[in-house]
Amino acid sequence: MYNTRRSAYMNSCSTAMELPPQSLHQNWQDTEYVNTTCSSDMNSDMSMYNDDKDDPFYEDEGSGGGTSGGGKKSSRKRANTTSSSGGNEKESKRTANKVCRVCGDKAFSYNFNVITCESCKAFFRRNANKEKEIRCPFNEQCEINMVSRRFCQRCRLTKCFAVGMKKEWIMSEEARLEKKQRVEENRERRLQDAMNRALEEACMEDESENSYDEAPAPSHQMSVRQYLANDDAPHKSSDEVQPHLGHHGYNQKEDKMMNFYQDGPSDQGDYSLPSNSCASSSQLDTSVNCGATTIADNGASPSNTVTIPAAVDVERKPIPTNVLFSASMSAIQDVAAIISNAETKNLGMCAPDVVNENLMNVAQAAVQAQAIVNHTQQLAAAVVAQQVVSNMAPVMPTVNPLDPLLAPAFIAPPMPTPINVPITTPIAGALSTPLPPPIVPPGHSSINPVIPIIPKEMPVSVSLLNQLEQTPAEMVTVPKDMLMKLIQKNSRSTCTCSCMCGRYPPGSCIVDEVTKDLLNGGSSNSSNATDRDETRLETTEDMQMNGLLPGDCNSSIQWLNQQSSAQAFVDPITHSMTAEEAQTQRERRDSIFGSFSAADQGTVTQPKSVQEETIWEHTVAENESRELSDEEIEKMEELTEISNQWISMRLDSMPILDLFSKKNVEKIVNGLKLLSSFRFLPQVDKRSVVKRGLFNYCVVKWMQHKESMSIDGLSDAARRDFMNIIRREEFNYRVQPGAFNTLAISVLFHSISDNLISTDVYMEHLVFKKLLDKNLPIKVSSDTVYNNYYPYIIKAAKHLEKATKGLSDELVAHAVS
């Protein structure tokens, strides 16, 4: 069919040209592409991947040996396949923000249960399960770092096991091969799915391109030419039909392709005009020309203008609107199809001026047909509106109101003047649907009826009473008589009486509380009233409403003072309950919120400080979220590792003064290097932290291990200060996991505001102070513990600094370096 339409179009051209058969299926650009690429396709090793860019291991360069079909020189060389070159986008996006626990190099994540670098991960996987014994070339005490890790395999492997790496987590050879096989299968499956999707998309594109040509014309639509031809068929004979474009024979019986489109030329049409004539060359006249459409397909059929014969009486035989509408829509679709399909590429070797002329003819015909449809619809709408107004006029009665003030509201609108202008364009198609007969009001036939009586709206209370009286049930959530009295005596003003007897919370509105009781369980006299009283004291809001807890508007101390002064008048608990019930409520409240009741306290003393006054609010604000973030979890793991190293080096069993020898100071500093917060500080800040905070750090470590670490060699005053530390209440918090480890690092980084080491050190101090808050028990603030404990720690550290005469700069520099 496509070839037939193509040949019909070529026959209509003034200069027909012979085209090869393959040109009917592809344009000259496609032919050129096939000719230029066939050689490269034939010489390709893999026809599916014949593009050099598809090979991830090779890339093109400007210089090379062979030449391609396009004349470009190219060569193939091995490309970089490391992750830094973008081979693995996931690895390149990762950031090595962790530190290897074995050598100190940068690491990505956990490997075999420990944060390690890629080098130590591979080393442990290769050597952990080896049966061959590895010997240390030195003294088996090698310090493993980024440089020395490749010198001693034994010490490196020993440290891997020491930090917690597990060889049980290494995959066996069978498991590794199985995992590799699964990866290969998944890769092949994804490749096959991608190829299937590509084939489906290609098929869908081909179907969408051919859908316009293969779509049959709707049976209920008719073109203008077909309508006129069918109407004029009895007046013409088949001999009078003129051949199309005289010098080319056109057999209408054999070839019906021109009737494929709904606005195509019919079998009995008039084609007397030249093929290059334009429908817009003559002025648009609705009494002569009803429409003109053209054929628009992939072959770009020529434009034709259809003229209605003079014998056709338009007023006697009007053209229906659906015919005009289908013709205009078809023409518009033809224009869109030609533009979207790039008709200039599908015309083969045709001249460009012929193509442009055809496009202009199609566009002008579409505009003309649309104008005819719009004009017809406007005239039809005007006639319909006139008839509707004339039919509705008798329905509106003329009213003579008794009150002159109401006259403007009831005056009937004036009768519209009928349209006497004759309509030249037929509107029979628009008025094909019969209009409904005019509505005649029943009964009153007089012209001036009385004013209609508008019934007054019944009050809501009356309607509710009528509904309740008709209800067969005796109970409607509440007794019917009670509800009826409430409705009858309903007042627009809201009752504001408050409860003073203790039945409801002090100051609460009785109406609101009774409404809540009715909604919850029916009558307030029901048997479950006691249960509701007990459940009202389960939440914080209920406690605050009943005066058992401080509200948002006052502090804890102010609330206690108010409760102590109000005890002489009414007790919200004991007034409405027995002694046993009141004690039960107090125990329930105290188990949830703590003992803060004024009834349990004899006298309320004034606070000692502002900090103790706001301890409740501060504690709730600080302990809202006790979840540890990922960064905080890593810091806690580092603190645990430092503590384990302190014990492994036997520093927990020696006198406290021996910790400040040169060898032990180096051990302590090496342990602190496991902490990323200390390791990433500048060298100058590290020395300042060690010189000023190491004594504070050792005091807290002595508090952790006071049973095994002695304080021999200190003066009596120093002993008393050390004993005062462990006698304080805060000393009991050392049983909390990680609490004193965090406190030790926090006092290590602490510096007074007048003499800050640096901003980085102070920020690290705040980080560990916040971490201390999450390690302490709930309702305990880190500010309270730190501010109450830190002066005693400083005082004990001064004794140590005085007894050891401080740390020399040479010792600190050697330990830190």
Swiss-Prot record:
DNA-binding stretch(es), residue numbering of this chain: 97-172
Gene Ontology terms, MF aspect: nuclear receptor activity; RNA polymerase II cis-regulatory region sequence-specific DNA binding; zinc ion binding
Compartments in which it is found: Nucleus
ZnF segments: NR C4-type: 100-120, 136-155
Location of the region described as Disordered in the Swiss-Prot/TrEMBL record: 49-91, 202-221, 258-284
Role of this protein: Orphan nuclear receptor.
UniProt record similarity statement: Belongs to the nuclear hormone receptor family.
Keyword field: DNA-binding, Metal-binding, Nucleus, Receptor, Transcription, Transcription regulation, Zinc, Zinc-finger
Superkingdom of the organism of origin: Eukaryota
Main location, first listed in the record: nucleus
Organism placement in taxonomy: Eukaryota, Metazoa, Ecdysozoa, Nematoda, Chromadorea
Compositional bias of kind Acidic residues: 52-62, 202-212
Keyword Phosphoprotein set for record: no
Any one cellular-component term (Gene Ontology): nucleus
Gene3D superfamilies on file: Erythroid Transcription Factor GATA-1, subunit A
Gly residues bias locations: 63-72
Protein name in UniProt: Nuclear hormone receptor family member nhr-48
